[in-house]
A protein has these predicted regions:
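Generic structural signal of hydrophobic/aromatic residues within well-ordered alpha-helices
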Residues: 15-23, 119, 123-127, 153, ...
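Active-site-surrounding "flap" and adjacent substrate/cofactor-binding loops of secreted or lumenal enzymes
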Residues: 65-66, 71-74
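Extended, solvent-exposed, turn-rich assembly/linker loops in the middle of proteins
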Residues: 131-200
Length: 299
């Protein structure tokens, strides 16, 4: 196919679903997306969520009837405060197949190695910052110590009547491997043994690279083309583990449609120009902070 016949709009539409699929597959927090079903507004950066407030039962009086009580429901507007993006250039190619291979490799790796880790890190830091359960930071260096700390986290959520079903335990790689050492395994008939931990006490267990697992991160503005992404906030600690119930959090990620410009429209280089942009944010509901528990490392 001649270069002049490659349609930029069609190319963008072709790759958009692929980018979305990579995000869903690679993100450790994607499982929490959209569980609260917010209602979108015309403004792409605003979503509405329904918040309720109510009191418990009162005595029924045969003379006066039902006890009055405040039960209210309101729509609250939440603004997505993170507006991130990046432009890519791919040298001019003579045919669509070669262009597609180059672009797919470039953007696929960008989503996997840059976008997904940043989204996960931002969400974990947000949830850690809002967690009601937050014991004194400590190093967990033994398998028994890890189990004791996780038991305390579960007990804390139990005491707040947080539902047991559906809880998710996110653990740093150090904690995850200590946890593996605390549990015994049995050889199966074919002589293999699977030591991976996917569930513990009814909770899904997800291992998180420490590079995504902090109680605070700084987003780099990227004004310098050689810099971007995020880093651990000075004074904020690494996380050992984070236990939460998905109903306590809301996270939104809006991947704006890709913009693609052919070389003859690119004013800076003889190259295809691709622009990627995403609005996103994460929230913990004010009345559900008890459903989030974080254990921090000492540094």
């Amino acid at each position: 196919m001649a270069l002049t016949t490659i349609n930029g709009i069609e190319l963008a539409e072709k790759f958009q679903p692929i980018l979305d699929e990579i995000y869903k597959k690679e993100s450790l927090t994607a499982r929490l997306d959209g569980l609260s079903k917010p209602v979108d507004h015309n403004d792409a950066r605003t979503v509405y969520v329904y918040k309720t407030s109510m009191v418990g039962l009162g005595d029924y009086d045969r003379a006066t009837g039902f006890a009055a009580g405040n039960v209210t429901g309101v729509w609250e507007a939440l603004e997505l405060t993170k507006d991130r993006g990046r432009a890519f250039s791919v040298d001019a190619m003579s045919d669509e197949e070669t262009l597609g291979m180059a672009f797919g490799t470039l953007v696929g790796e960008f989503i996997r190695t840059k976008v997904v880790p940043e989204l996960d890190a931002y969400r974990f830091a947000t949830y850690a910052g809002k967690a009601s359960g937050k014991p004194t930071a400590a190093a967990l260096t033994t398998s028994s110590g890890v189990l004791t700390a996780i038991d305390l986290a579960q007990k804390t959520l139990d005491g707040k009547e947080v539902p047991r079903e559906g809880r998710v335990l996110y653990a740093s790689e150090d904690i995850y491997y200590l946890l593996k050492g605390a549990l015994t395994r049995t050889w199966v008939s074919d002589g293999t043994v699977d030591r991976n931990i996917e569930r513990l006490d009814g909770m899904d267990v997800v291992m998180v690279p420490q590079t995504r697992f902090y109680e605070g991160i700084d987003l780099i503005n990227g004004s310098d083309p050689s810099t971007g992404g995020y880093g651990q906030t000075s004074g904020k600690k690494k996380l050992n583990f984070l236990l939460l119930h998905p109903s306590a959090v809301l996270q939104i990620a809006k991947h704006n449609p890709l913009r693609v410009f052919a070389p003859d429209l690119n004013q800076t280089a003889d190259a295809w120009l691709f622009q990627y942009r995403i609005y996103h944010d994460a929230f913990v509901y004010d009345n559900k902070t008890d459903s989030v528990y974080v254990h921090r490392y000492t540094s």
